[in-house]
Amino acid sequence: METNSHYFYVLSCRDGSLYAGYTNNIEKRLKTHNDGKGAKYTRARLPVKLHYAECFSTKREAMQAEYYFKKLSRKNKERYIEEKRREGVDYQPAKEF
């Protein structure tokens, strides 16, 4: 069963690196990462914080955004986030995790 919201998200890791992923529940996914049960990459770089997120109506769109983002250089990743924020795209959760 598909949910109505699909998210491409970017985490800031303790070492300053960025991690990009897909989820349909940002709050739960961020908790999973910080509990050390998320991606292997983030387990070694805890704690992580939500740096950026975009909401899409389909899983496919969110995963395409993630795929595109992962191919960018670090400089272009930051530029992508800055441009999207200027456009008002950045998803902000109701509470801090």
UniProtKB/Swiss-Prot annotation:
Protein name: UPF0213 protein BLi00048/BL00536
Annotated ranges, domain GIY-YIG: 4-79
CDD domains: GIY-YIG_UPF0213 (cd10456)
SMART domains recorded: GIYc
InterPro entries noted in UniProt: GIY-YIG_endonuc, GIY-YIG_endonuc_sf, UPF0213_domain
SUPFAM superfamilies with a match to the protein in the record: GIY-YIG endonuclease (SSF82771)
Superkingdom, taxonomy of origin: Bacteria
Similarity comment text for this entry: Belongs to the UPF0213 family.
Top-level taxonomy: Bacteria, Bacillati, Bacillota, Bacilli, Bacillales
Signal peptide region: none
